[in-house]
Amino acid sequence: MNKDMWKLSPKNIAALGIGSAVFVIVGRFASIPSGLPNTNFELVYAFLAMIAMIYGPTVGFGVGFIGHVLLDLMMYGQTWWNWNFAAGFLGFFIGLYALRVNIDQGEFSAKEMVIFNVVQVVANAIVWFLLGSVGDMVLNSEPAAKVFAQAGLTTLMDGLTIAVLGTILLKLYAGSRVKKGSLHKD
């Protein structure tokens, strides 16, 4: 377990700030409408998964939450707090799995990829259905059919985005790291 992932070190604070800015940029320019109101195919969640796996749950939550708040304010002039917290907790839950993987040491095996994808699909379902949908029903008096349709489509689209693009990004990242014990002194 990498205990540094829980700390707000200068490196993690920089990752939080830069990650939030990148979240806004990618969310603004790489968002594809789905046809369902306020529900888009968001490539930014592959980036969030990568950040959460590299820096852990604290930075994962911060980038998801802050990035989503800033993106909402920029795009709509207001924010939906339950969906912002949902994005933050998606980063947090994926970041929790990062504590069990040595991705910084070049390790991301097929088994770890499968577990990562199970974790992210479950996390997507939890955050978008519970925080997103139930939050909209309680806070905004939105009809259940509408918000559960949005949550279902969001879970599917974000899960697929992370499964494909997020897994590729993480495998490339792990491949760029020096494996533990691979360097030998002659």
UniProtKB/Swiss-Prot annotation:
Keywords in alphabetical order: Cell membrane, Membrane, Transmembrane, Transmembrane helix
One GO cellular component term: plasma membrane
Gene3D superfamilies with a match to the protein in the record: 1.10.1760.20
Protein's UniProt keywords contain Endoplasmic reticulum: no
Matches recorded under InterPro entries: ECF_substrate-spec-like (IPR009825), UPF0397 (IPR022914)
TM helices/strands, residue ranges: 13-33, 46-66, 79-99, 114-134, 150-170
Pfam families documented for this protein: ECF-ribofla_trS
Membrane topology: Multi-pass membrane protein
Localization terms from the record: Cell membrane
Superkingdom per UniProt: Bacteria
Family that this chain belongs to: Belongs to the UPF0397 family.
HAMAP family given in the database record: UPF0397
Name of the protein in question: UPF0397 protein Ldb1710
Source organism (scientific name): Lactobacillus delbrueckii subsp. bulgaricus (strain ATCC 11842 / DSM 20081 / BCRC 10696 / JCM 1002 / NBRC 13953 / NCIMB 11778 / NCTC 12712 / WDCM 00102 / Lb 14)
Lineage: Bacteria, Bacillati, Bacillota, Bacilli, Lactobacillales
